[in-house]
Curated annotation (Swiss-Prot):
One of its GO terms (biological process) is protein complex oligomerization. This is Matrix protein 2. InterPro entries: Flu_M2. It is a single-pass type III membrane protein.
Length: 97
C-alpha cells in the first residue's frame, strides 16, 4: 500500500502510482506528519497505562525543592499549613434532617 496521498491504478499490466505532485513539499510534509501521528497513536495505545500513570503522579508531587535550603523549605511548609488552617473557617457544615 502506498502513502495516503498516492492513488494506485492498474497501468497496462503493472500497478503504478499516478501522482502528479508527489515531490510537492506540502505532500511530503503531510505524509510525514501522518506517519508520525500513526506511530504516536500506536505507542499511546500500547503504553497508555505507563504514560498516564507517570503524568498523574508527576503532577501530584508539587513544586520541586531541589537546591532550596532546608530553612526555606520549612518556611514554605509553614506558609502552606497556615493557608490551610486559615481556610478551615470558610467551610460550612450542612446537616440534613
Amino acid at each position: 500500500m502506498s502513502l495516503l496521498t498516492e492513488v494506485e491504478t492498474p497501468i497496462r499490466n503493472e500497478w503504478g502510482c499516478r501522482c502528479n505532485d508527489s515531490s510537492d513539499p506540502l505532500v511530503v510534509a503531510a505524509s510525514i506528519i501522518g506517519i508520525l501521528h500513526l506511530i504516536l497513536w500506536i505507542l499511546d495505545r500500547l503504553f497508555f497505562k505507563c504514560i498516564y500513570r507517570f503524568f498523574e503522579h508527576g503532577l501530584k508531587r508539587g513544586p520541586s525543592t531541589e537546591g532550596v535550603p532546608e530553612s526555606m523549605r520549612e518556611e514554605y511548609r509553614k506558609e502552606q499549613q497556615s493557608a490551610v488552617d486559615a481556610d478551615d473557617g470558610h467551610f460550612v457544615s450542612i446537616e440534613l434532617e
